[in-house]
Design a protein with these regions (language model features):
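Residues that define the transmembrane beta-barrel architecture of outer-membrane proteins
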Residues: 50, 81-87, 122-128, 146, ...
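Residues on the lipid-exposed face of transmembrane beta-strands in outer-membrane beta-barrel proteins
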Residues: 56-58, 89-93, 103, 130-136, ...
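Long, hydrophobic/aromatic-enriched structural stretches that serve as scaffold segments
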Residues: 79-131
Length: 317
């Protein structure tokens, strides 16, 4: 198949809109010390005409407050603040024409302040994610049948969990959740002229882990996590594209020593505005801003904030 400018535009639009949307999901979830990111896709989703890509993404986010166990939003107290930084290095390659494999390696840094405590900065390697995607049908190929894709991912606990030693008084050295995570998902998307509409559902399950030293050990298992995402994107004739995405992540109560730990469930909404600017046939810039919508009672047991992302991608056809 030869790739005309119109086909290439649709292809880039689909890859960009969903890739950037999931990037903000990953970051928002990673900021939760108790919860893992969705991890089902990377910010480097391949366009249909692309064979491989590599990229680097920089993230900056600030915590503005948190949702308590009753779902009420509370701003940070005086003297308390948090700045989260992350640099993601990722690559993706196409297999079987409609499939793709990807790898993401994150570096994570955190700066925290608290009243009566000196400022603290720490970080390191985060949890590495490998992912896969297979498109059974393609968006825009049929007027009646949308694009349908299966998503899968596996996250390795390469980061340091919050219970690790020598993390600092404010635990800024924590960079992971300390558990393996398996993700599966389903994406449905369709194009309508220059518009793209997407709906995705993701399911994540984490392995159990033992925390502490005998005889004071605690057996912990995080509950399953569900994420629901919808996106709307528009591509201009220049192939510049803009998108708006909304997501909602839900997680049940954790199990502690086999007993349901009531009051530990989580909820977090995220609203994202993103864009892509093609620099050439092989290079593109992607950017996004997101906010966790500090509205009672949308969240639960979660820090809430806002962030900025900037990504550069090099692809091959």
């Amino acid at each position: 198949m030869s790739w005309t400018p119109a086909r290439r535009s649709v292809s880039l639009k689909i890859a960009f809109a969903i890739g950037v949307a999931f990037t903000t999901l990953d970051h928002a979830a990673f900021a939760q010390s108790c919860c893992a990111g969705t991890g089902a896709v990377t910010p480097g989703r391949l366009a249909l005409h692309e064979f491989a890509l590599v990229g680097v993404q920089a993230k900056t986010a600030v915590d503005l407050g948190s949702f308590d166990r009753g779902g009420h939003y509370v701003a940070n107290p005086s003297g308390a603040s948090e700045l989260d930084l992350e640099q993601d290095f990722f690559a993706a390659i196409r297999i079987f024409k409609r499939g793709q494999l990807a790898l993401l390696i994150p570096l994570v840094e955190t700066r925290r302040t608290a009243s009566g405590v000196a400022d603290e900065f720490g970080g390191g390697l985060g949890d590495i994610n490998a992912s896969a995607r297979y498109d059974f049908t393609l968006a825009g190929a049929s007027q009646f049948v949308p694009g349908i894709a299966a998503l899968a991912g596996f996250t390795f606990p390469s980061g340091r969990p919050a219970d690790s030693p020598n993390l600092g008084p404010l635990a800024t050295g924590a960079t992971g959740i300390g558990a393996y995570q398996i993700n599966v998902g389903l994406a449905v998307e369709q194009t309508f002229g220059p518009w793209l509409v997407n709906a995705t559902v993701l399911y994540a399950q984490r392995t159990a882990r033992t925390v502490g030293d005998a005889p004071n050990t605690v057996h912990e298992r995080l509950a399953a996590q569900w994420t629901f995402l919808s996106s709307l994107a528009y591509t201009f004739p220049s192939e510049v594209a803009l998108a708006v995405s909304g997501s909602y992540t839900i997680e049940g109560d954790a199990l502690i020593n086999g007993v349901d730990n009531v009051g530990t469930a989580h909820r977090l909404p995220t609203l994202t505005f993103s864009g892509v600017y093609p620099l050439s046939d092989s290079w593109r810039l992607q950017g996004a801003i997101y906010d966790n919508l500090q509205i009672t009672p949308l969240g639960l047991n979660q820090p809430a904030g806002a962030g900025l992302l900037l990504t550069i991608v090099r692809s091959w056809t």
